[in-house]
Structure formats: structure tokens, C-alpha cells
């Protein structure tokens, strides 16, 4: 059970009388036993009624739907960026196994995996927003200006790259392992024995068959990526579900 009560928000207002507090307590159903409150919540949940936010007074379902779009957009952009970075590096790592490309990719994947997202986000903000002043510090659009695609892309760049880094390290290694496994298959050796250029063998035969498990892995990682968006959305003030969750926790 979480500590605190919505009534504490009312009690902070010294002008609220004890009678009004008690009336609100009955209205919210907080006078009922905990098990009654729980089963009431379950019943309302399956009816699509999540109640109203104690913080804003808005229906919770409305807040979720408003935040869902930005979170999906951020996650989609992060997945695209992660694929554009990871798949080429994974391919090169497998192609030049135990050489410079492979060692460099291994170091990069280690750094991407081990660096906390909030730390990377602060570095991005300091470099691109404070020092270089080329990217906005937060939000989804420029405040007080027309909402344009250009403004959206500028605001989307940093949080999507930071979120993508959570996926890049493991995706590089997964692509590399999948490539190496396919490269040992007989049909690859047959293609090489026919004199087909190595680049064509890698792209047409190896990569095409390696992407099947990679796509499956991506499908499993996307829900975790959405969960990891909480910190990223909070740092960049991105108006998604993660920011709503963060604000709700600390308000309560």
C-alpha cells in the first residue's frame, strides 16, 4: 500500500473545514474498508472507469490517452535510431570478427549498456542545449509558437537518442551473434564457392536470414523500452505516460 492520502491535499489548505474533509472522504469512498475500496476499484477498472486524478482532477483514462501518443512516438523513434546504429555495427563486427571493427563495437556496446540514461540525458542537455544552443532543452514543441514538424523533430532528437542507447548495446551483440551463426551455414559457403562477391553474400544471404531473430528480439524489447521511457521523459519534460507517472508519484 502506498503511503499518503488524497485528503492530505485538502488538509494542506487551511481554509478547508473538518466537515468538508469528512464529506470528501465519504465521496471518495475512503470511509470504506480497504477490501471494499479494492473491489470497487477492480469493478470500475473492468468497466473502463479509472476514476479522476487527485492531482489534476482530469479523468485518468483521458490523461493516459493524451500521454500515449507522445510515448509511442518517442519509442518508435528510439527503435528506428537503435536499428540504424546497431545493425550496421553488428554486421561489421561479425564480418571482421576479432579485429578493429569488432573490438570497437564491443567497447561501444559496453558503454551504451552501462551508461545510465539519466546521466547520458544530462550530458546531451549540457552539450547541445546549454553549450552549443542548437537543440531545445525540453518539451515537445516550442512554447508560444506554431506546432511544426521541424519543431517536433528538434525536440524529439535528444530523448529518442538517449532512449535508443538502452537498446543499442544488446542489439549490436545480438545482431553479431545472429550473423556469425548464419555465416557458418552451408548455403553461405556454397555462395562463396560460386564466386559471389563477399559484400553481396553478406547483404543478400547472411543479413537477410540474420534479421529474423533480431526482429523477434526487438518485439520483446519494445515493452521494456516503453518502461524505460519514464526517466527520459522526466528529464526532457516529454509529455508522455512516463512523465505523467513520475509527476503522479511525487505529487502523492
List each language-model region with its residue ranges:
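Alpha-helical transmembrane segments of integral membrane proteins
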Residues: 65-101, 117, 146-252
Amino acid at each position: 500500500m502506498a503511503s499518503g492520502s488524497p485528503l492530505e491535499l485538502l488538509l494542506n489548505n487551511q481554509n478547508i473545514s473538518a466537515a468538508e474533509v469528512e464529506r470528501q472522504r465519504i465521496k471518495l469512498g475512503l470511509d470504506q474498508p480497504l477490501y471494499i475500496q479494492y473491489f470497487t476499484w477492480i469493478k470500475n477498472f473492468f468497466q473502463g472507469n479509472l476514476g479522476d486524478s487527485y492531482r489534476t482532477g482530469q479523468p485518468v483514462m483521458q490523461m493516459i490517452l493524451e500521454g500515449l501518443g507522445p510515448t509511442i512516438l518517442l519509442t518508435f523513434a528510439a527503435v528506428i535510431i537503435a536499428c540504424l546504429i546497431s545493425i550496421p555495427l553488428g554486421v561489421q563486427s561479425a564480418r571482421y570478427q576479432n579485429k578493429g571493427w569488432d573490438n570497437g563495437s564491443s567497447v561501444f556496446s559496453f558503454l551504451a549498456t552501462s551508461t545510465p540514461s539519466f546521466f547520458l540525458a544530462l550530458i546531451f542537455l549540457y552539450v547541445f542545449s546549454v553549450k552549443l544552443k542548437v537543440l531545445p532543452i525540453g518539451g515537445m514543441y516550442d512554447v508560444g509558437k506554431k506546432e511544426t514538424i521541424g519543431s517536433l523533430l528538434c525536440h524529439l532528437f535528444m530523448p529518442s537518442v538517449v532512449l535508443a542507447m538502452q537498446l543499442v548495446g544488446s542489439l549490436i551483440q545480438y545482431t553479431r551473434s545472429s550473423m556469425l551463426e548464419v555465416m557458418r551455414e552451408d548455403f553461405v559457403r556454397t555462395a562463396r564457392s560460386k564466386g559471389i562477391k563477399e559484400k553481396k553474400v553478406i547483404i543478400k544471404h547472411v543479413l537477410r536470414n540474420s534479421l529474423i531473430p533480431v526482429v523477434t528480439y526487438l518485439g520483446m524489447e519494445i515493452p521494456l523500452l516503453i518502461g524505460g521511457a519514464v526517466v527520459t521523459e522526466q528529464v526532457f519534460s516529454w509529455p508522455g505516460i512516463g512523465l505523467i507517472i513520475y509527476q503522479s508519484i511525487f505529487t502523492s
